[in-house]
């Protein structure tokens, strides 16, 4: 193999694995040569009410983007995640909840989860929620968040989860776009010892005059904090479920019925509602969970993601539960109340598989041995990384320090849009290279293309595309199929463009090099530069703004904002704080710029287009080769920006 550090497959993993290297190669070849045959067989990993006979109907052709899988089959997601396990493991733990406060925890068995989900599903029906209605979930990381998701799927309602860190404005935008009928929230959330005012944010969001369809708000009592109450609109969760029956037959859903909408940032400002459907998504989440994490019966799996992100959907709730796993739902943050909290949780619950983000790993790495103080982490068998590419130094630290050099790391590459993991090692099959996502999962056909769309072979770099569909692929942008085609299929005709660049080495391993479009990846959260720019320009003292990402040791990317102010407004420490607070309010803390670079003018072409390529280079200090600046309306702007950058503290 080509790279300096190679970690061969561990013999103890290989001895009891779902797929060794020979199995991987044989299955992968079949999945590419005969996708119909492959998915016809592996589609049976979930239980169907009416078995499918049609497997794959997909087209990436311009003007005919159409993705359908298992389309004549019917099933229910909640029945696959709960009911099918009741006879064999009804008394086994399904969800382990670990509170923000280390003294708080609880478990739900599959039987208890079934009861809770049925009751809440009936409570939703009582409030008029019907099959096909959209329900917005804005919840803390408590078991009821998973219960709410599963209750929606039980009755055929479509959920759209909004991360609890988003502001009222961002929440309102998602409620409006999805046409949600009901909101599920809590009085407050708790995170890192602080209360998060969820109900207050919902109340503010619903004041937006464009929010027209919300008839009810279901409120979970999490902290008992004071909240405003709207008598005919708001309902306490505990009161609604107290009188609900715990018998709720699962709704029979078509494979292509919508399952959920999840908003993700685009480069054009307005967030995109990624639509996933029932059959293909569940097959893919179930299959990837089983093989990527090499899940064995009775193991404890901990995905540290929030349910508000796709990782929480696929690998905290649906993938684990469909496989009958024990899944941990963690309310807190990895370094509270102690730096070693993540390791403490691993020991406390004897976690076998840990799936976390490079951001968390880098933050803990900065603390050295404090991150593992007083812990052994002996239970760990497999570790994973998700959200952004992991740099080799962080990979090595994670492997050595957290994993005691005995747990292989699955460095997984995928997106909200893909529904599940696309490029990844398999623990019993793949020799590891720190920093490489390695090889494609079954049925996934990656390719690298140059900027003209020509496929480039061998060891090379290029734009990462996918040549054919897989069951977990998003079907459309909610309410805007043209935008779906425009965003993902117009750059390179007949291919799905991921928006990422990648390098392929001589062993065929993929190394993700990051976004090639104007989307930032901050702490594993994707945000469009346009969304942040829009928020900045909406501030009454700002004339213009341009946002770029710069490398950051902990977060992966930091947000660097170039700002021109209105006439008569001058930079000050006070304005600096005002601008940051404004973005926090408009979008959320995650979008707060790390650097504000005040300037008089931005580099623009004569047609008025901002030259972001130049801004990126200046922000990262890479000014030796700025490329062609002849198209700039005023080339002197560049020298001014470089001088200003040098003055920034």
UniProtKB/Swiss-Prot annotation:
Question: Which residues are annotated with the PTM N6-acetyllysine?
Answer: 609
Identify which cofactors the protein needs according to its UniProt entry: Mg(2+)
- Output the PTM entry: Acetylated. Deacetylation by the SIR2-homolog deacetylase activates the enzyme.
Per UniProt, the keywords (alphabetical) are:
Acetylation, ATP-binding, Ligase, Magnesium, Metal-binding, Nucleotide-binding
Q: Which InterPro entries match?
A: Ac_CoA_lig, ACAS_N, AMP-bd_C, AMP-bd_C_sf, AMP-binding_CS, AMP-dep_synth/lig_dom, ANL_N_sf
Residues annotated for ATP binding in this entry = 387-389, 411-416, 500, 515, 526
| Chain sites annotated for binding Mg(2+) | 537, 539, 542
Which EC number(s) does UniProt give? 6.2.1.1
What would be one Gene Ontology cellular-component term for the protein?
A: cytosol
**Where on the tree of life does the source sit, at the highest rank?**
Bacteria
Q: Which reaction(s) does its UniProt entry say it catalyses? A: acetate + ATP + CoA = acetyl-CoA + AMP + diphosphate
Gene3D superfamilies documented for this protein: 3.30.300.30, N-terminal domain of ligase-like (3.40.50.12780)
Example GO molecular function term?
metal ion binding
**List of residues binding CoA:** 191-194, 311, 335, 523, 584
- Please name the GO terms of the biological process aspect recorded for this protein, alphabetically: acetyl-CoA biosynthetic process; acetyl-CoA biosynthetic process from acetate
Described by its record, this protein's role is as follows: Catalyzes the conversion of acetate into acetyl-CoA (AcCoA), an essential intermediate at the junction of anabolic and catabolic pathways. AcsA undergoes a two-step reaction. In the first half reaction, AcsA combines acetate with ATP to form acetyl-adenylate (AcAMP) intermediate. In the second half reaction, it can then transfer the acetyl group from AcAMP to the sulfhydryl group of CoA, forming the product AcCoA.
NCBIfam families recorded for this chain? Ac_CoA_lig_AcsA, PRK00174.1
**What protein family is recorded?**
Belongs to the ATP-dependent AMP-binding enzyme family.
Q: What is the designated name of this protein?
A: Acetyl-coenzyme A synthetase
């Amino acid at each position: 193999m080509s790279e300096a550090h190679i970690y061969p497959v561990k013999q103890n993993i290989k001895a009891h694995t779902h797929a060794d290297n020979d199995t991987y190669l044989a299955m992968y070849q079949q999945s590419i040569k005969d996708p119909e045959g492959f998915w016809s067989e592996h589609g049976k990993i979930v239980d169907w009410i009416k078995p499918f006979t049609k497997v794959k109907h997909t087209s990436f052709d311009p003007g005919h983007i159409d993705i359908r899988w298992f389309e004549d089959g019917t099933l229910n997601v909640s029945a696959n995640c709960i009911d099918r396990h009741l006879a064999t493991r009804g008394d086994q733990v399904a969800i382990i909840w670990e509170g923000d406060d280390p003294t708080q925890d609880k478990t739900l068995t599959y039987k208890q989860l079934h009861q809770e989900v049925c009751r809440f599903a009936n409570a939703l029906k009582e409030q008029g929620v019907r099959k096909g209605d959209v329900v917005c979930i804005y919840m803390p990381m408590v078991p009821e968040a998973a219960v709410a998701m599963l209750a929606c799927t039980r009755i055929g309602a479509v959920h759209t989860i909004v991360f609890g860190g988003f502001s009222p404005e961002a929440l309102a935008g998602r409620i409006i776009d999805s046409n949600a009928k009901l909101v599920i929230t809590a009085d407050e959330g708790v995170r890192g010892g602080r209360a998060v005012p969820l109900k207050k944010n919902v109340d503010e969001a619903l004041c937006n005059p464009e929010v027209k369809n919300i008839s009810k708000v279901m409120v979970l009592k999490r902290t008992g904090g004071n909240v405003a109450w709207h008598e005919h609109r708001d309902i306490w969760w505990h009161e609604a479920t107290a009188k609900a029956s715990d018998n709720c037959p699962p709704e029979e859903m078509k494979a292509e019925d919508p399952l959920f909408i999840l908003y993700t940032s685009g480069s054009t400002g307005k967030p995109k509602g990624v639509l996933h459907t029932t059959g293909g998504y569940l097959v893919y989440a179930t299959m990837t969970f089983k093989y990527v994490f090499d899940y064995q019966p009775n193991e404890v799996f901990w995905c540290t993601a929030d349910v508000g992100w796709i990782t929480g959907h696929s690998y905290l709730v649906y993938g684990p539960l469909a496989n009958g796993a024990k899944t941990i739902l963690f309310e807190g943050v990895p370094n509270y109340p102690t730096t070693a909290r993540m390791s403490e949780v691993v020991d406390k619950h004897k976690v076998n598989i840990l799936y976390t983000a490079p951001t968390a790993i880098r933050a803990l790495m900065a603390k050295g041995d404090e991150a593992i103080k007083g812990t052994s982490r002996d239970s760990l068998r497999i570790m994973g990384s998700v959200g952004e590419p992991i740099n080799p130094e962080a990979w090595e630290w994670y492997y050595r320090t957290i994993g005691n050099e005995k747990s292989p790391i699955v460095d997984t590459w995928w997106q909200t849009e893909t529904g599940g993991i696309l490029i990844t090692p398999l623990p019993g099959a793949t020799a590891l290279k720190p920093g490489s996502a390695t090889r494609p999962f079954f049925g996934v056909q990656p390719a690298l293309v140059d900027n003209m769309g020509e496929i480039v072979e061998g060891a090379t770099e290029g734009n990462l595309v996918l040549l054919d569909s897989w069951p977990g692929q998003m079907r459309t942008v909610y309410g805007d199929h043209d935008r779906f085609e425009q965003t993902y299929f117009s750059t390179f005709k007949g291919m799905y463009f991921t928006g990422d660049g990648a390098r392929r080495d001589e062993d065929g391993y993929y190394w993700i090099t990051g976004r090639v479009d104007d989307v930032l990846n901050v702490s594993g959260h994707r945000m469009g530069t346009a969304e942040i720019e829009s928020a900045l320009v909406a501030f009454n003292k700002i004339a213009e703004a341009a946002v770029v990402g710069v490398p950051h040791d902990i977060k992966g990317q930091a947000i660097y904002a170039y700002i021109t102010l209105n006439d008569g407004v001058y930079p000050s420490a006070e304005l600096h704080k005002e601008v940051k607070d404004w973005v926090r309010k408009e979008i959320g803390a995650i979008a707060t710029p790390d650097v504000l670079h005040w300037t008089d003018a931005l580099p623009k072409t004569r047609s008025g287009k901002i030259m972001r390529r130049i801004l990126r280079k200046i922000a990262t200090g890479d000014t030796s080769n700025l490329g062609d600046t002849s198209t700039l309306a005023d080339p002197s702007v560049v020298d001014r920006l470089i001088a200003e950058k040098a003055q920034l503290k």
